[in-house]
């Protein structure tokens, strides 16, 4: 998900 893909 995006929570872990918060580059």
Curated annotation (Swiss-Prot):
The lineage of its organism: Eukaryota, Metazoa, Spiralia, Lophotrochozoa, Mollusca. Exhibits modulatory effects on the peripheral nervous system. Inhibits activity on a central neuron. The modification Tryptophan amide is found at residue 7. GO terms for biological process: neuropeptide signaling pathway. This is WWamide-1. Keywords: Amidation, Neuropeptide.
């Amino acid at each position: 998900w995006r929570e872990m893909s918060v580059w």
